[in-house]
Amino acid sequence: MTVMVTPAVALTGITASSTIGIFDSLPEYIEIGQQPERNTLYAQYSGEGNENGYIAVATIYDQNRQEVPYDQISQFALDAAVAGEDERFFTHGGVDVQSVIRTALDNVVAGGIEGGSSTLSMQLVKQIFVQRALELPTEEERKAAYEEATAPEFDRKLKEMKLAIGLEKKYTKKEILTAYLNIAFFGDNTYGIQAAAQRYFSVDAKDLTLAQAASLIAIVQFPNSRDLSTPDNYADNEARRDVILESMLRLGMVTQDEYQEAYDTLVDDNFVKPSATTNGCIGANRYAKWFCDYVVKNVKNFEFLGATETERQENWDRGGYQLYTTLDMDVQIPAQDQLWAYVNYNETAMNLGGASVSMEVGTGRVLTMSENKVYDNTLEGGGPGTSAVNYNADLEYGASTGFPGGSTYKLFTLLAWLDAGKGLAERISGDARTVDQARFLDTCTDGGGPFGGPYPFKNDGGQTPGAIDVSTATAGSVNGAFI
């Protein structure tokens, strides 16, 4: 293993003994593992576009990635990766000695590392270390680990060589190529060939054309200047894409006609077919944003994610979950539309808010969750008519510190009245009066009161109706009667 790279090392000025020391200090191989992916929330729906009675309503992720198996990747993309990044991928054992020696000579002339010679296996090793760095808990740790994983030093290259050789012993070529295409960064917070195909061309990875596949592989070396998120990058992307196409033709991966058709395809707005990024509840289906927010704030309670709240949050952040929720869009859509119709979110005459939740009797399953405000949790906010405060939930799950219950409590007073055997036709005083609040005990807190002193309760309209029957008092929401 060491002998394979010793000639190249000698050309760089590093001794063979130091090479052996670096090699011996490393494990035999590195685990590929599973990379962070998107979480997807689904709601019940019987309308057009549903799959088995459900429809996706939100995607939530730290990294926009969806891992796919080898057979779900276009052959054009597989071939483009090999042609563009590692022509001898299927014949070397992790390190392309021919490229290493050529690059080493270039480095000697340049007086430092100028790049090159990294096989797909070596690039995969590097990306695994980069990914691990990005998942560290603090910014300081992430920065230090990222710099170590990307440092332009010979030691790093040697580590990548050693681990790439071990990688080739543990995994098949198909597994390594698939892992590379799933971990690669394609710019614009897009990771992996599937997310890249969807982001830039609105297709799945298995359906990529030759021109599309080559354009995506053209991104990986310099994502910032070649990704397809902006027309400013189109020219650089096309130039690199054409180099990859020429390599594919030379290697016999495509026919002359296939090559010419792809080569003649301009990288422009007609070629790029981007799909909108919809990360988080702000990008969720407009009828599911508040429920999405409620679900995300409940992650710490999902026992299937782990034994502790910390473990649950970490697993959720790594993603890859398909969460089928209780939200029923067949009921949610009309519920939300009705709330918007009768409690306008743009109302400026008063601080008007409205919320509505429907639960299934017997199970407590939340079927609808609506609010008149438009959900917006961005730092700058969405202006009047928007909010990030979920009126349907408790403080712990997205609400504010609360609002006065007001006349909603009259319902419970009425129920207690009826439960005591009294009738709706009985007459009581509806006049305003001063009441000693110490008479009322708080049975929901330790100690139970008493709280407060005399308070002058008034009727909203200032009326003094005298004796009034309970039915009329309820219809008129007369405060004096309920006190």
What are these regions (language model features)?
Residues L216, T413-W417, F482:
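Buried hydrophobic packing segments
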Residues M161, N479-I483:
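A small/polar active-site loop signature that marks catalytic segments
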Residues M1-W340, N344-Y345:
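Juxtamembrane regions of bacterial inner-membrane/periplasmic proteins
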